[in-house]
């Protein structure tokens, strides 16, 4: 069973996907997009982004595989962050605040990032102002399984 754990965004080609994935059109936007995410993952797996157009970032939990699958749209319109705890857990969310509210987060300033920002006035790459909190870069998906993290560009 696949569960949507986190979602932020909008799927622009929802009508086409509803037709292809046999999803009723009379659902609310929230229900419809949740079903699209689940059925697209069940149908296409890691390649689901090849079939979706829009701006989105999400996390799906695959109970049967005990695997977390997170994806960010190719343009990076919606953010997605993750953090590995000292005890081997993965915290994640579409905002840093969601990560900070979870047990296991250690709030520590990323001084290297602060120096870069003060020099360039721009935050680039996967680093954030909090040590250990990283951005999932645009056009990437993340898989967390058995305590191991793998990030792939799609």
For each feature predicted by the language model, list its residue ranges:
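Cysteine-centered catalytic environments shared across enzyme families
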Residues: 1-154
